[in-house]
A protein has these predicted regions:
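Beta-lactam-recognizing serine transpeptidase/beta-lactamase-like catalytic domain environment
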Residues: 90-138, 143-280
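Short hydrophobic alpha-helical segments used for membrane anchoring or interfacial signaling
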Residues: 84-89
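Extracytoplasmic/periplasmic proteins that interact with beta-lactams or build/remodel peptidoglycan
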Residues: 1-83, 97-128, 133, 280
Length: 280
């Protein structure tokens, strides 16, 4: 009896993006399983193949992945745990999707036990692009800035902040990266410098219910327009938050969690004049 097996010529490179078809299905293998199995060929040709005992060839599936971008992202991550993804903001085309640590889809079946029972920190089968949740860090300052602009549409350009490298409020301190002092800054400069002190200061002035509403407009605590399995991003701060939580949340720390894919969607919507294209 002839045994058929899938071959994945790029090994780990497209492990999470393309997925695997042994021990279940993931990635494109799962999304396009029906297309890969059915045959739209000539009816007579398919009938003759069936009579001859030959297997009908399934349909082809063409992805949007860019091999060069995928290789660059894969190499840039090196041995670090993490994720890299890119999309065309104007169309929604996913151009690359890399998650590490990865695995070889050619050997999933034989290595299944070690993959699911191995070092939990490795979590090689986890697609960190869509399923990993992390503090957004300075990327959240986009939301803090946007909420401030909404609340002060005619005056946000007048904002000034003198950064000494440490922003002290009550008994709390927020430090800029390497305690770097940015000096006197306006709103745009504070954003360009990703000044922690300035954005912690901005956060204290915001309507917290409005900030939460904005976060949910940008799909925190909401379903994402994705076909792949994903983890829902989380924004917890509400109007009853204390000062420390406000300071932390305003600069992307605290309890806020986001997936790399969700972050990519937000950035793509901004790059596309506020319009989010459905990723594919």
């Amino acid at each position: 009896t002839e045994i058929e097996t899938r071959e994945y010529p790029y090994g780990e490179l497209f492990a999470h993006a393309v997925g695997y078809s042994s021990a279940g299905k993931t990635g494109v293998e799962a999304l396009a399983n029906f297309q890969l199995l059915r045959a739209h060929g000539n009816f007579l040709e398919n009938g003759l193949k069936e009579l001859a005992g030959e297997k009908k060839t399934g349909d082809s599936v063409v992805t949007t992945f860019n091999l060069r971008l995928q290789q660059i992202a894969y190499e840039a991550l090196g041995d670090r745990r993490g994720a890299v993804a890119a999309m065309d903001p104007s169309t929604g085309k996913i151009l690359c999707m890399v998650s590490k640590p990865a695995f070889d889809p050619n050997t999933v079946a034989e290595n299944w036990e070690s993959l699911i029972h191995g070092d939990t920190a490795e979590a090689r089968l986890l697609n960190r692009v869509t399923q990993g949740l992390y503090p957004p860090g300075s990327t959240f300052k986009i939301l803090t800035a946007l909420q401030y602009m909404r609340e002060h549409p005619g005056a946000y350009k007048e904002y000034r902040f003198d950064c000494s490298g440490i922003f002290a409020y009550e008994s709390y301190q927020i430090r800029c990266y390497h305690q770097n002092a940015h000096g006197e800054q306006d709103f745009a400069q504070a954003f360009a410098n990703s000044c922690n002190g300035a954005f912690a200061n901005l956060g204290l002035s915001l309507d917290l219910a409005g900030l939460k509403g904005l976060a949910e407009q940008l799909l925190f605590n909401r379903d994402l327009p994705l076909s792949l399995p994903y983890s829902k991003s989380s924004y917890q701060m509400d109007s009853g938050a204390g000062d420390w939580e406000i300071l932390q949340t305003s600069i992307g720390q605290g309890q806020t969690l986001i997936s790399p894919m969700h972050n990519l969607l937000i950035m793509s919507a901004i790059a596309n004049d506020g319009v989010l294209m459905r990723p594919y």
